[in-house]
Regions:
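FAD-site-proximal beta/loop scaffold in flavoenzymes
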Residues: 1-36, 122, 130
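Short beta-turn/strand-loop junction motif enriched in small, turn-promoting residues
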Residues: 18, 46-47, 86
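Helix-loop-beta segment of a Rossmann-like dinucleotide-binding subdomain
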Residues: 49-53
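Histidine (H) residue identity feature
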Residues: 9, 24, 46, 145-147, ...
Length: 171
Protein backbone atom coordinates (compact mmCIF):
# COMPACT_ATOMS: atom_id res chain seq x y z
CA UNK A 1 0.00 0.00 0.00
CA UNK A 2 0.91 3.64 -0.12
CA UNK A 3 3.36 4.70 2.58
CA UNK A 4 4.62 1.13 2.98
CA UNK A 5 8.31 0.51 2.23
CA UNK A 6 8.93 -2.69 0.28
CA UNK A 7 8.21 -5.48 2.74
CA UNK A 8 8.06 -3.08 5.67
CA UNK A 9 5.36 -1.59 7.85
CA UNK A 10 3.03 1.16 6.72
CA UNK A 11 4.78 4.25 8.05
CA UNK A 12 3.45 7.32 6.26
CA UNK A 13 0.22 9.19 6.80
CA UNK A 14 -1.43 12.46 5.90
CA UNK A 15 0.61 15.12 4.11
CA UNK A 16 3.60 12.82 3.45
CA UNK A 17 1.45 10.06 1.93
CA UNK A 18 0.30 10.04 -1.69
CA UNK A 19 -3.22 10.97 -2.67
CA UNK A 20 -5.65 13.72 -1.78
CA UNK A 21 -5.07 15.88 1.29
CA UNK A 22 -8.12 14.94 3.37
CA UNK A 23 -8.30 14.97 7.17
CA UNK A 24 -10.31 11.74 7.32
CA UNK A 25 -7.83 10.03 4.97
CA UNK A 26 -4.91 11.16 7.16
CA UNK A 27 -6.66 9.84 10.27
CA UNK A 28 -7.29 6.45 8.69
CA UNK A 29 -3.69 6.30 7.43
CA UNK A 30 -2.41 7.19 10.90
CA UNK A 31 -4.39 4.35 12.48
CA UNK A 32 -3.23 1.90 9.79
CA UNK A 33 0.40 3.04 10.24
CA UNK A 34 0.23 2.60 14.03
CA UNK A 35 -1.33 -0.86 13.67
CA UNK A 36 1.30 -1.86 11.11
CA UNK A 37 4.20 -0.62 13.25
CA UNK A 38 2.74 -2.56 16.20
CA UNK A 39 2.78 -5.70 14.06
CA UNK A 40 -1.00 -5.84 13.72
CA UNK A 41 -2.66 -6.51 10.37
CA UNK A 42 -3.38 -3.17 8.71
CA UNK A 43 -5.30 -2.54 5.54
CA UNK A 44 -6.48 0.65 3.93
CA UNK A 45 -8.36 0.60 0.63
CA UNK A 46 -7.69 4.03 -0.86
CA UNK A 47 -10.43 3.42 -3.45
CA UNK A 48 -13.00 3.58 -0.65
CA UNK A 49 -11.96 6.97 0.78
CA UNK A 50 -14.71 9.50 0.10
CA UNK A 51 -14.31 13.19 -0.61
CA UNK A 52 -16.83 15.99 -0.31
CA UNK A 53 -17.20 19.59 -1.38
CA UNK A 54 -19.48 21.60 0.89
CA UNK A 55 -21.23 23.67 -1.76
CA UNK A 56 -24.95 24.07 -2.41
CA UNK A 57 -25.77 21.42 -3.45
CA UNK A 58 -22.98 19.37 -1.91
CA UNK A 59 -20.70 17.12 -3.97
CA UNK A 60 -19.56 13.70 -2.83
CA UNK A 61 -17.28 11.29 -4.64
CA UNK A 62 -15.66 7.95 -3.94
CA UNK A 63 -13.89 5.39 -6.11
CA UNK A 64 -13.78 5.71 -9.87
CA UNK A 65 -15.65 7.81 -12.40
CA UNK A 66 -16.87 6.17 -15.60
CA UNK A 67 -13.83 7.55 -17.49
CA UNK A 68 -11.41 6.28 -14.82
CA UNK A 69 -13.05 2.85 -14.91
CA UNK A 70 -12.65 2.70 -18.70
CA UNK A 71 -9.01 3.81 -18.43
CA UNK A 72 -8.41 1.05 -15.86
CA UNK A 73 -9.71 -1.57 -18.31
CA UNK A 74 -13.20 -2.06 -16.92
CA UNK A 75 -16.35 -2.18 -19.04
CA UNK A 76 -18.34 0.28 -16.93
CA UNK A 77 -22.03 0.11 -16.19
CA UNK A 78 -23.53 3.38 -14.98
CA UNK A 79 -26.80 4.20 -13.28
CA UNK A 80 -28.12 7.61 -12.43
CA UNK A 81 -30.96 8.98 -10.35
CA UNK A 82 -31.83 12.67 -10.74
CA UNK A 83 -32.72 14.30 -7.44
CA UNK A 84 -35.76 15.90 -9.10
CA UNK A 85 -37.24 12.36 -8.98
CA UNK A 86 -36.56 12.08 -5.22
CA UNK A 87 -39.62 12.75 -3.10
CA UNK A 88 -37.47 13.68 -0.12
CA UNK A 89 -35.37 16.15 -2.13
CA UNK A 90 -38.61 17.71 -3.37
CA UNK A 91 -39.86 18.15 0.21
CA UNK A 92 -36.63 20.04 0.99
CA UNK A 93 -37.15 22.19 -2.09
CA UNK A 94 -33.64 21.11 -3.16
CA UNK A 95 -34.04 18.89 -6.20
CA UNK A 96 -30.91 19.90 -8.15
CA UNK A 97 -28.34 17.17 -8.68
CA UNK A 98 -28.06 13.42 -9.06
CA UNK A 99 -26.60 10.19 -7.74
CA UNK A 100 -24.43 8.32 -10.25
CA UNK A 101 -23.05 4.84 -9.58
CA UNK A 102 -20.28 3.19 -11.60
CA UNK A 103 -19.74 -0.55 -11.66
CA UNK A 104 -18.03 -3.23 -13.72
CA UNK A 105 -20.43 -4.70 -16.28
CA UNK A 106 -18.81 -8.15 -16.20
CA UNK A 107 -18.81 -8.70 -12.44
CA UNK A 108 -21.27 -6.07 -11.26
CA UNK A 109 -18.67 -4.88 -8.74
CA UNK A 110 -19.29 -1.37 -7.43
CA UNK A 111 -16.41 0.87 -8.54
CA UNK A 112 -17.45 4.39 -7.59
CA UNK A 113 -20.03 7.11 -7.24
CA UNK A 114 -20.49 10.79 -7.81
CA UNK A 115 -23.25 12.55 -5.92
CA UNK A 116 -24.40 16.13 -6.36
CA UNK A 117 -27.27 16.57 -3.93
CA UNK A 118 -28.35 17.84 -0.57
CA UNK A 119 -26.34 15.95 2.08
CA UNK A 120 -24.03 14.37 -0.54
CA UNK A 121 -21.26 14.40 2.08
CA UNK A 122 -23.40 12.02 4.17
CA UNK A 123 -24.77 9.92 1.29
CA UNK A 124 -21.37 9.06 -0.19
CA UNK A 125 -20.37 6.91 2.81
CA UNK A 126 -22.80 4.14 1.79
CA UNK A 127 -20.97 3.71 -1.49
CA UNK A 128 -17.57 3.83 0.24
CA UNK A 129 -18.73 0.98 2.46
CA UNK A 130 -19.93 -0.93 -0.60
CA UNK A 131 -16.55 -0.53 -2.30
CA UNK A 132 -14.73 -1.56 0.89
CA UNK A 133 -16.85 -4.72 1.16
CA UNK A 134 -16.69 -5.62 -2.55
CA UNK A 135 -20.42 -5.06 -3.05
CA UNK A 136 -22.09 -5.21 -6.44
CA UNK A 137 -24.51 -2.82 -8.08
CA UNK A 138 -27.15 -5.51 -7.49
CA UNK A 139 -26.32 -5.55 -3.76
CA UNK A 140 -27.06 -1.82 -3.60
CA UNK A 141 -30.27 -2.22 -5.63
CA UNK A 142 -31.42 -5.03 -3.32
CA UNK A 143 -30.77 -3.04 -0.13
CA UNK A 144 -34.08 -1.74 1.18
CA UNK A 145 -33.88 1.97 1.92
CA UNK A 146 -36.30 3.90 4.11
CA UNK A 147 -38.91 5.90 2.18
CA UNK A 148 -38.89 8.81 1.69
CA UNK A 149 -35.18 9.53 2.18
CA UNK A 150 -32.36 11.03 0.18
CA UNK A 151 -30.45 7.74 0.44
CA UNK A 152 -33.12 6.05 -1.68
CA UNK A 153 -31.53 7.79 -4.65
CA UNK A 154 -28.50 5.50 -4.28
CA UNK A 155 -30.72 2.43 -4.52
CA UNK A 156 -32.58 3.96 -7.46
CA UNK A 157 -29.31 4.71 -9.29
CA UNK A 158 -28.34 1.05 -8.86
CA UNK A 159 -31.73 -0.04 -10.18
CA UNK A 160 -31.24 2.30 -13.14
CA UNK A 161 -27.87 0.69 -13.94
CA UNK A 162 -29.61 -2.71 -13.95
CA UNK A 163 -32.50 -1.36 -16.07
CA UNK A 164 -34.90 -2.04 -13.18
CA UNK A 165 -35.70 1.53 -12.17
CA UNK A 166 -39.30 2.41 -11.42
CA UNK A 167 -38.98 6.16 -10.77
CA UNK A 168 -36.75 7.08 -13.72
CA UNK A 169 -36.27 6.01 -17.31
CA UNK A 170 -33.87 3.11 -17.57
CA UNK A 171 -30.61 3.75 -19.43
Amino acid sequence: GRGRPAGGPLSAAGAVAAGPMLAHKAGAEGIAAAESIAGEPAALDHRAIPAAVFTDPEIGTVGMTEAEAEAAGYDPIVGEMPMRASGRALTFGESDGFVRLVGDRGTGTLLGAQIVAPEASELIAEVGLGIELGATIEDVADTIHTHPTLSEATMEAAENALEQAIHTLNR
